[in-house]
């Protein structure tokens, strides 16, 4: 493969335009096409206790903090995803709209890099999900836009109430701005079973709201809290927010290994 798979969109420098990127490898090198999805996302990354996250990885995998870009140094990603549509390999709609929150760790197994999905919260009907780590929860999203001639402020409020007592809240506001288009391939594996994996061919718009490494602080009133279960171990008060990004559009093609 001419280009190594990137573990995350957050490896991409925040101002990288699509025209400046190297061509992606042919899609048939990624595996068997299994569908596509369209979403809107908000992503936070954190630096948390290395020992805690290492113990959550599959055998043979080691922690590999994000090496560059707005999330440099982060070892945990929290994705707030609003799924708008999903189609199967035949192009027919599957599933419906859904809000979910996904936790993942950047990791390495020898030369292979990926994000290990350690936990996800979504509607009970979809748990435990493809990666086998989903937990039933009520996920509530409120988003508002105040704009004049499409210039204005967006406010988001997320809450997660897991059936096992897990709780997550996120609130933030930011000025609407022109996203940078980023196209990238990314691999995810299940922390419960690394043989369960997908590769995504992603086309997205990226707006950096906050980045400690790059000195960016455009998020307004950002508050995040997570408690209960695994969340309590990850967010024990010592965590540091590394970055926050908005992905106003996020479309991906899904590929799985031929043997899966």
Model-derived segments and spans:
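Aromatic- and glycine-enriched beta-alpha-beta binding-site module
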Residues: 83-159
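Generic structural microfeature
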Residues: 15, 47-48, 100
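Sec/Tat signal peptide C-region and signal peptidase I cleavage site
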Residues: 16-20
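Generic structural hydrophobic/aromatic packing signal, biased to beta-strands
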Residues: 44, 78-79, 103-105, 118-119, ...
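Interaction-surface and assembly-scaffold signal
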Residues: 23-24, 136-260
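Bacterial N-terminal signal peptides that target proteins for export
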Residues: 1-6
